[in-house]
Amino acid sequence: MASEPASATTTVAVPDEARDRARELGWEDGLIDAALARGFSLQEVWQALRAGVDGATARSFLESGQRGPQPDLRWMTVPTEWGIRARPSDPAMGLTIGDINVGTYGDVPDTWPHRSEIARGSYPKPAMEDMGYTIFDKAVVWADCVVPLYEQAIRDRWAPATDLRWASLEALPEDVERAVSQLMTELSERSYHQGVELGRWLPEISYGFLEAKLFLSTVIFDLARHTEAFRKRALVNGGAVGLQAPTDYMRAVTEARSYPELLATLFIQDSTLLTLYRNGDRFAQSQLERDLFALAARDRERLLQYQVQRLKHYLFRHPERRDEQHIYFTKAENRVGKEWADPAVSGPLALLLAGGRERIAGGLTALREFRRQQVAEYQAHLAAATIPRERLGGRLWAIVKPADA
């Protein structure tokens, strides 16, 4: 609140210590009283004294007629691109992040030059703190599709609490409910773990690649939603959360030492889970589960599109890193192959494919065919990313190889 000017009839008692401090600083006698008469408060005088303002500066300031410090308006003249008038390219979509990528603000450099949290297009200060970013290479994280995918993601909202008809579930045979609960336990855990790992890497990506960071934030939210929805299904129909999912593959994800290694390791899970969700009606025991798989598939489709386009762009910019990616794929495939052989992973799917415990042998045969479908689609997605892969990791190949191979 601004200080009120002292009136002519108001006497302000100036403490002796204030006058003593003024003399130490070279204030001539009467300068404090002159400042008070000019309308400055005793508190403002004290602030000047404590700040060490000398007498000459104080006298000059009073003689200038200024009531207070003048604002520094140099921020109004920084040489950023002025006169931008972004407009929606599609009125139905509104003003998108793509629409504001105009002029220099839409230029995403191949290498981001700043280590601070400067926004793209801002004018940098002479010196700023290093904020700890480690990813400055656009090719590592970028795909042009992140811009439209972000817009799709923020519009494709669904809430497990209200968009799934939980009250519609009916009791299932115990063996079937146990299989559903175990599958949902695994899917919830995998969603949670992937969201945690992506969240761990998000702060490493420089602010200059804002659109990629925005899209990845929607992926993390999608995975949190999947964690919630699958866990709810395990606990809503008389079942329970089942046995912990195997962690060999999750460990490989956690051990990734770079963002390209992380995404290469996640590629097989992103692809095979998308195939699972798209074929959810083969495992679903209710309309709610069909709806749940369909909604989860929509989210996973966006993530896999980013995976394919990012890897394609990365290999175009860094062809020398192609062989390295195969190392990561082999490691991930072997971990997945080991987990697919785990009874806690294969058993529930086989039972659900068969329709019951007594027919599980036929379900195991059907599951082997489904695994082949998952792997074939995984290979197709890699081919779309310009890195075809005919030779698979041995443990994965053992699951899907033909009987006569």
Where would I find each of the regions flagged by the language model?
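Alpha-helical transition-metal enzyme core signature, strongest for iron centers
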Residues: 187-195, 216-234, 263-274, 293-311
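Long, hydrophobic, well-ordered secondary-structure blocks that form the structural core
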Residues: 194-254
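Secondary-structure edge/capping motif, primarily at the C-terminal ends of alpha-helices
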Residues: 202-206, 281-284, 314
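Short, charged, amphipathic alpha-helical segments
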Residues: 213-217, 291-294, 323, 327
